[in-house]
Regions:
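Helix-to-beta-strand junctions that scaffold the AdoMet/dcAdoMet cofactor pocket
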Residues: 46, 69-70, 138-142
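Conserved SAM-binding loop of SAM-dependent methyltransferases across substrates and taxa
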Residues: 57-71
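Residue-level signature of catalytic and energy-coupling elements of molecular machines
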Residues: 36, 55, 119, 195
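C-terminal substrate-binding/active-site "lid" region of AdoMet-derived donor-dependent transferases
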Residues: 84-85, 132-199
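Conserved class I S-adenosyl-L-methionine
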Residues: 46-57, 73-75
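N-terminal auxiliary segments of SAM/dcSAM-dependent transferases
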Residues: 1-25
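Conserved alpha-helix/loop element of class I SAM-dependent methyltransferases that forms part
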Residues: 2, 27-50
Length: 200
C-alpha cells in the first residue's frame, strides 16, 4: 500500500484514509477521491489544518477529510436540517468536525470561525462561484480552495465546456487556478478545480 498524499493511501487502484482502521474512499461517492484517481497532482489537505467545507451533506467526504486532518478542524456547513442528521452522527465520533446548519450563501451568519487554510465546496447551485467568493473572506492569503463544479446546476442547456470556461475565467479574477480535472466517468458534467488565494 502506497501513501500517495499525506493521509491518503492507494492499493490495487483503490483509495483509503485511515482512522483506527483503513476506510475505503469511494470515487463514485466522493469527488475528491475521483479527482485523485483521475490524476490530481496536488492535494493540499494536511494534518492540523482548518477547513471550511461547504455542502457537507451526509458527511461521507467530511469523514475522510477528518481522518486526514487529525487534530485539525472542519467547519462543515449544510443547509438541510434533514440531511445534517447523519453528519451529526459522524461528528459524535470525530472531535475535529464542527457541523453548522447554515446557508453557505450567507457566510456572515456562521459566527466566528477565524481564518481558514482551505475551502472545499460541493454545492449544486447556480451561484456556485459566488458562494465560493463570498466564503473566501475566511481564506488565508495563499490558502487553497477545491471546488466540485457541477455544470448542469449552472445551466442545464448550454455546452458544458463553455460553462467550465466561463467559470474558470470568473474564478481567475480572484484566485490562481492550479489544476482542473474532469471527473468523468465517476461524475458526469463535473469539473474539479484546485486553486489558491494568492491574488489578495
Amino acid at each position: 500500500m502506497e501513501e500517495i498524499f499525506p493521509g491518503v493511501y492507494k492499493e490495487n487502484g483503490n483509495l483509503y484514509t485511515k482512522d483506527e482502521n483503513l476506510e475505503p474512499w469511494n470515487p463514485f461517492v466522493s469527488k475528491p477521491a475521483a479527482a485523485i484517481l483521475k490524476g490530481l497532482k496536488n492535494f493540499p489537505l494536511r494534518k492540523g489544518m482548518k477547513i471550511l467545507y461547504l455542502g457537507a451533506a451526509h458527511g461521507t467526504t467530511v469523514a475522510h477529510f477528518s481522518n486526514i486532518l487529525g487534530e485539525g478542524i472542519i467547519y462543515a456547513v449544510e443547509f438541510s436540517s434533514k440531511v445534517i442528521q447523519k453528519l451529526l452522527e459522524k461528528a459524535k465520533n470525530k472531535e475535529n468536525i464542527v457541523p453548522l446548519l447554515e446557508d453557505a450563501r450567507f457566510p456572515e451568519n456562521y459566527g466566528w470561525i477565524g481564518k481558514i487554510d482551505l475551502i472545499y465546496e460541493d454545492i449544486a447551485q447556480r451561484d456556485q462561484i459566488l458562494i465560493l467568493k463570498r466564503n473566501s473572506v475566511f481564506l488565508k492569503k495563499d490558502g487553497y480552495f477545491m471546488l466540485a463544479l457541477k455544470a448542469k446546476a449552472i445551466d442545464s442547456v448550454r455546452d458544458v465546456k463553455e460553462i467550465y470556461s466561463e467559470a474558470l475565467k470568473e474564478l481567475s479574477k480572484n484566485f490562481e487556478i492550479l489544476e482542473t480535472i474532469n471527473l468523468e466517468p465517476y461524475e458526469k458534467d463535473h469539473l474539479f478545480i484546485l486553486g489558491k488565494n494568492s491574488k489578495h
